[in-house]
């Protein structure tokens, strides 16, 4: 009768076998082969080597010379890596670190130990930074590890400005260096950094590298270099740049700089990064094109070039069902908050505020960042690396009540903390950040004094939050109590645009749609009026803005011209230059959705975005 061993007994059986093999190695029992690397000898067992390594299995079973040799010499493999791999075979422990991971990976690759190589590869990916990505890239290329090569190349190009400051880049060969500085894909904002890098690389070994200087200078886009920087480089590197060919290259660059219209050099990736208006939403009908559906995309606009782009919508896949609000953090991370999709809600016990962030390079998708206790009509703000969910309407004991609670989320620590509450309960308010302080503006606040009237009053209050003190203070009030307005920060001043409201404190007087622009100066704690909008305009959501600031100018993307939510929205983009104090329509019939939700401003690269469909571009009509 056969008795099968299962579960814990089977595990114990395997453990016993491993322990006995370990003991045999330690006692040098039944040793039948010795590996030699860098002169160091490693007694071991052919059976163990063959079990873990197809390379050794083939060596010991295919009639090769080593079949009958007691000693096998391993060339181009370090003794340390052999020791690490044998320890893994006999002890089930892989001891890798930053110093040895490449040599261990190389040995594992040589011995065809795929599991070990995969662990080493993951370790290098997880520990990649600006100081080592270049070495990882060339290592991966050398052994043909495509995944690692692709990942390290993306990291290298994306972080090239930081990589260029490390010693590792000064050690690479001239052909490798040339390939790098030729690339259009380097994420650098100024060509001066490439010129500086070329001179540092040559100076690192003048005797051998000066001969390559002319060839290297030809790859620097000198016409993009500031003339004063170029003159300074000449003065500091007289001995290097005195070669006649170098002088010709530099003189031609000076001539080209004076007449830039005659030249059209390719910009590098980082030079194309610019501030864009992002109208992020998830209208399921979306923009329809003969070529494809843009329902899963959100509208982007470059006010400088007047070009349109799209990014993926946070509704893609099983993302957000509704986008309620958003914010762009100090480090340019794009955040949106809303409610889960219907399919996702059906599988959840509790309804939450779902918060997502966008990956903008190489992985154009939204990922879930965190969730917060469910509420509606809240505001979302940020200071440094922290998010703040402020006020809103919460369900408490089966009643929807407006709250004053404020929750802070640390992206770095991945935790929530309740901070000092608002001085009053608020919903449908807005929040902006100026000089590392939050400013909460307008909204609704409940009133209990007059039960026969509206249950809520509009607020004209401005509240300031100082995170260093965890304290709120009341600042100068607005002229109008309002909600459904848009906000933006221009030149460190807060602009509040349009909305529904009434003059002064809301005491039940008639409310109307506003074309009013109110501007707050945080330094002086005072408000002034700006130029009225061309017509009364409401934001597209009660707690989100459809305005943003780019290069010191204010832009409003669409909006409602009346209080009826069912009206067709305006598809115009308005521009206000604070110096001219006048509104201009800069685009009409733009390719935004019939209904979008949140307007944000972020620095993005058009290369990472989705171009508009050609048939809709033809239909579009811009000023």
From Swiss-Prot:
SUPFAM superfamilies for this protein: Kelch motif (SSF117281), POZ domain (SSF54695)
Transmembrane segments: none
Organism whose genome encodes this protein: Homo sapiens (Human)
Recorded superkingdom: Eukaryota
Domain called BTB: residue spans: 31-98
Pfam families recorded: BACK, BTB, Kelch_KLHDC2_KLHL20_DRC7
Keyword Repeat: yes
Biological processes per GO annotation: proteasome-mediated ubiquitin-dependent protein catabolic process
Swiss-Prot/TrEMBL keywords: Kelch repeat, Repeat
Keyword flag Repeat: yes
InterPro entries: BACK, BTB-kelch_protein, BTB/POZ_dom, Kelch-typ_b-propeller, Kelch_1, SKP1/BTB/POZ_sf
GO CC aspect terms: Cul3-RING ubiquitin ligase complex; cytoplasm
MF terms in GO: ubiquitin-like ligase-substrate adaptor activity
SMART domains: BACK, BTB, Kelch
Protein name: Kelch repeat and BTB domain-containing protein 12
Kelch repeat ranges per the UniProt record: 386-436, 437-492, 494-547, 553-603
Residue ranges occupied by any BACK domain in the UniProt entry: 133-235
């Amino acid at each position: 009768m056969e008795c099968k061993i299962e579960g814990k007994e089977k595990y114990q059986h395997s453990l016993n076998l491993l322990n006995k093999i370990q003991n045999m190695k330690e006692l040098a029992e039944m040793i039948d082969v010795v590996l030699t690397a860098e002169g160091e000898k490693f007694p071991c067992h052919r059976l163990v080597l063959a079990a873990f390594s197809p390379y050794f299995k083939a060596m010991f079973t295919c009639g090769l010379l080593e079949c009958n040799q007691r000693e096998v010499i391993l060339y181009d493999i370090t003794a340390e890596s052999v020791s690490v791999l044998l320890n893994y075979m006999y002890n089930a422990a892989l001891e890798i670190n930053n110093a040895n991971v490449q040599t261990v990976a190389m040995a594992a690759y040589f011995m065809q130990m795929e599991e070990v190589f995969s662990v080493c590869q993951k370790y290098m990916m997880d520990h990649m930074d600006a100081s080592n990505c270049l070495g990882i890239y060339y290592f991966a290329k050398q052994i043909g590890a495509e995944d690692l090569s692709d990942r390290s190349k993306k990291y290298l190009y994306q972080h090239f400005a930081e990589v260029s400051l490390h010693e590792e880049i000064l050690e690479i060969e001239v052909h490798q260096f040339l390939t790098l500085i030729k690339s259009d894909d380097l994420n650098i904002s100024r060509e001066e950094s490439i010129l500086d890098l070329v001179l540092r690389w040559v100076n690192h070994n003048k005797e051998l590298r000066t001969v390559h200087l002319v060839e290297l200078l030809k790859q620097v886009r000198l016409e993009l270099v500031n003339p004063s920087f170029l003159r300074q480089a000449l003065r500091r590197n007289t001995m290097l740049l005195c070669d006649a060919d170098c002088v010709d290259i530099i003189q031609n660059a000076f001539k080209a700089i004076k007449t830039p219209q005659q030249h059209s050099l390719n910009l590098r990736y980082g030079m194309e990064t610019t501030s864009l208006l992002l109208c992020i939403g998830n209208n399921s009908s979306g923009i329809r094109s003969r070529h494809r559906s843009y329902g899963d995309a959100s509208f982007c606009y470059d006010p400088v070039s007047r070009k349109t782009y799209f990014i993926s919508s946070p509704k893609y896949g099983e993302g957000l069902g509704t986008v309620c609000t958003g914010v762009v953090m100090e480090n340019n991370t794009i955040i949106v908050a809303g409610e889960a999709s219907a399919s996702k809600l059906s599988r959840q016990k509790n309804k939450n505020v779902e918060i997502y962030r966008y990956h903008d390079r190489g992985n154009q998708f939204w990922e879930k960042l965190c969730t917060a206790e469910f509420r509606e009509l809240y505001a979302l703000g940020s200071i440094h690396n922290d998010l703040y969910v402020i006020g809103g309407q919460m369900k408490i004991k089966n009643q929807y009540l407006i709250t004053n609670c404020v929750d802070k989320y640390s992206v770095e620590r991945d935790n929530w903390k309740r901070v000092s509450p608002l001085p009053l309960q608020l919903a449908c308010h807005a929040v902006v950040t100026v000089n590392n302080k939050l400013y909460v503006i307008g909204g609704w606040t409940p009133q209990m004094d007059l039960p026969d009237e509206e249950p809520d009053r509009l607020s004209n209050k401005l509240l300031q939050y100082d995170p260093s003190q965890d304290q709120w203070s009341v600042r100068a009030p607005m002229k109008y109590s309002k909600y459904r307005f848009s906000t933006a920060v221009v030149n460190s001043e807060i602009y509040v645009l349009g909305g529904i409201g009434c003059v002064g404190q809301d005491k039940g007087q008639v409310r109307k749609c506003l074309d009013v622009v109110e501007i707050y100066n945080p330094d002086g704690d005072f408000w002034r009026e700006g130029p009225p909008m061309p017509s009364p305009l409401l934001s597209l959501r009660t707690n989100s803005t459809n305005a943003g600031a780019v290069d010191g100018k204010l832009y409003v993307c669409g909006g409602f011209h009346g209080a009826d939510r069912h009206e067709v929205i305006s598809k115009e983009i308005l521009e206000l230059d604070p110096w001219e104090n006048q509104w201009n329509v800069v685009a009409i019939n733009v390719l935004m959705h019939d209904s979008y939700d949140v307007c944000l401003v972020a620095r993005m690269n058009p290369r990472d975005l989705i171009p508009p469909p050609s048939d809709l571009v033809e239909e579009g009509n811009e000023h």
